[in-house]
Amino acid sequence: MANQTIFKRYEYKYLLTADQKKDLLAYMEPYMKSDKFGRNTICNLYFDTPDDLLIRRSIEGKVYKEKIRLRTYGRAKDDSEAFIELKKKYKKVVYKRRVRTEYADAVKYLCQGEDTIEHSQIRRELDYAMQLYQGIRPAVYLSYEREAFYGRDDHELRITFDQNILWRTTQLDLSAPVYGRPLLEKDQALMEIKVGHGMPLWLVHYLTEHKMYRTSYSKYGNAYRTIVTEKNESKGELEHVS
């Protein structure tokens, strides 16, 4: 059971400039503590069906959304700690199930269907999802630099800042070097506020006063939109030539 984690929370996203981030970091210092890992490089593989069903459902704004991903902290080795995550969103509430294992075992389970992760309730949910979404495979690599903080008085409150968000659709392997195409401008950061209940008043007041507004920004979703746009443009060029 120690290798399983279950989250239920609300997540709110904001796109910030470098100055906005700097000012907020200074303001929230009395309320938040830096995560013990400090600044991390987070590497992810998002899994999807051959027709990209999961991400299409997500960006179409369905009430129920689901994502399956493999995550490591930094470039992976076979024995690196890895997390297989099943992330569901229903009516704005995020439910995340996570299994911790070694990277090589995670790949064998997700890509080859081998029985390499411990049996548990979360494993059963993963098995069901893998059977439901036939032909599921790695679709997009995403990495980013993350700074994470948690509340001094409320440990369910987490605030993260993601920068240097990179994506690619080739070399879909977390043991490969960290590289890809950028999603954000150089001075931008994606802030995520994660709460188990209501947002604290000090944070609500700050966001309101500084006119910081929520966005529905999705890293995988924006990468997918770029893929579709470029495919359509390429198709249009070919039709024009013919």
Language-model-detected regions and their locations in the chain:
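Phosphate-end processing signature that detects enzymes handling 5′-triphosphorylated RNA
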Residues: M1-S242
